[in-house]
Amino acid sequence: MDLIRNFSIIAHIDHGKSTLADRIIQHCGGLSDREMEAQVLDSMDIERERGITIKAQTAALTYKSRDGKTYNINLIDTPGHVDFSYEVSRSLSACEGALLVVDASQGVEAQTVANCYMALELGVEVVPVLNKIDLPQADPERAKKEIEDVIGIDASHAVTCSAKTGLGVQDVIEEMIARVPPPTGNAADPLQALIIDSWFDNYVGVVMLVRVVNGSLKPKDKITLMANGSSHLVEHVGVFSPKSIDRPELSAGQVGFVIAGIKELKAAKVGDTVTHSPGQQGRVPATEPLPGFKEVKPQVFAGLYPVESSEYDQLRESLEKLQLNDASLLYEPEVSQALGFGFRCGFLGLLHMEIVQERLERQYGMNLITTAPTVVYQVEQSDGSILSVDNPSKMPEASKINTILEPIVTVNLYMPQEYVGAIITLCVGKRGIQMDMNYLGRQVKLTYELPMAEIVLDFFDKMKSISRGYASMDYEFKEYRPADVVKVDILINGERVDALSVIVHRSNSQHRGREVVAKMRGIIPRQMFDVAIQAAIGSNIVARENVKALRKNVLAKCYGGDISRKRKLLEKQKEGKKRMKQVGNVEIPQEAFLAILQVDD
């Protein structure tokens, strides 16, 4: 046990986490040079391209240290983005230590801080590492000071390295072995293993990545998953080096995979505890699950519709397959008059939503229309019942509503001092309430309470553009609060288009209605009759634009002549247009649905 070390790497996007992981794997000989490729642990194309890690991965390596002992080190790769913070907390609770990687040229950023605090709360030993010291603009002293000011851990003996060139990587491993404690746990106790991650493999079913805390696990054991009580027979256990290698058993302190013929990913939830099923000789089930398991709840909802309605079944299959690998994705069928059949999907956050969309388009070749993302409102109706509304079309009539509650999140923003004014203006414009403001060295930390609905649309993009990309943020759900929000409907020729409805704050509703209507006017093609585009709140019309009819010049053949002859022809044309308007319907082009997403304040 004393020779095992379990650790993960915490870093902000682009601070070199995956590259450092590559170097450590190479240094310990986990893969031959031929199999080595950049970002070994990021297995999805999107992960590579965006340079982010979404799913947790592991590598079990052996390292011969300078004191002559051979250590087994388990590297558990964690996602870095706030949307996946639950996955991070599970990965961290499987470790005794974490390398805090900070880019020496950029200093500390928000998501690093969020994940680092999570590590400290879980009692994980944090080892600071300064990366990218080969860059000319690297300033290790400033970065050390920032780690001390912002996070509050001692960084005087932080290791410096450059993951790109491989400089100092051995020092990082040595420092980690010296400072991270070996795992505690007892191989003789009843089995308790924490599921760090699970994914679906086409050949063997669900593969669970586990950290064995107590006890041991062999093939042919019967196991029970404690959150839902299902039992399974273990077929294989083993470790990743990042290639999978079967082992005869996994015992306390080790990290490895378990394959037990589970068909549904929903059964093997991240954070759940695996133990032995009762009634096996010499195997006692654990009485208590490991702490910290919670169901992940989606925060953002959007409708996904296939462009061709014939692709509906294909979209359903694609979503089913995606859900095999992403248990936090929820979806249910819904029908829209404008867009036909599709699905209402729930996501952890905006990045998650983008990634799901991208994976559907890339891996499954779908063409999708996405409606504006919404958050879940709690509506207290006049009969006292409470309704959760994740779709504007489900919002009851105004007369039946007592109060509407909206989700509020606490947002931590970090930025260089020169951008504070602009960011504060942005937050105030988004109905934010300032809770706190700290100066930490050259950085400023702002804490705001903001309505989730304001963040969902374009807060992140705006924050990045006004701070030239230097500001970073993380957010967590706080509570539901009463809010004065209304539903804005868009009517085209007096008919409501459900997919274009949005729920906005009353103070912003008229402006929003006008903007959308003006934008739609430019997008809807001219018809043979006038098209009226209106925005309505309840039965009040707040904005209107007309798309003028295309018409033939009926007077072309009249040269000179009597005015009454011309009038007769014009009246006749008018009658025809009127008749057309009664029977004609307007095709709404695809861009119209996207336009809703891009309305500026």
UniProtKB/Swiss-Prot annotation:
GO terms for biological process: positive regulation of translation. InterPro entries: EF-4 (IPR006297), EFG_III/V (IPR035647), EFG_V-like (IPR000640), EFTu-like_2 (IPR004161), G_TR_CS (IPR031157), LepA_C_sf (IPR038363), LepA_CTD (IPR013842), LepA_IV (IPR035654). GO terms for cellular component: plasma membrane. The keyword NAD does not apply. Belongs to the TRAFAC class translation factor GTPase superfamily. Classic translation factor GTPase family. LepA subfamily. Residues 2-184 form the tr-type G domain. It catalyses: GTP + H2O = GDP + phosphate + H(+). It comes from Polynucleobacter asymbioticus (strain DSM 18221 / CIP 109841 / QLW-P1DMWA-1). The keyword Secreted does not apply. It is found in: Cell inner membrane. Required for accurate and efficient protein synthesis under certain stress conditions. May act as a fidelity factor of the translation reaction, by catalyzing a one-codon backward translocation of tRNAs on improperly translocated ribosomes. Back-translocation proceeds from a post-translocation (POST) complex to a pre-translocation (PRE) complex, thus giving elongation factor G a second chance to translocate the tRNAs correctly. Binds to ribosomes in a GTP-dependent manner. Keywords: Cell inner membrane, Cell membrane, GTP-binding, Hydrolase, Membrane, Nucleotide-binding, Protein biosynthesis. Its main location: membrane. HAMAP family: LepA. It is a peripheral membrane protein. This is Elongation factor 4. Disulfide bonds: none annotated.
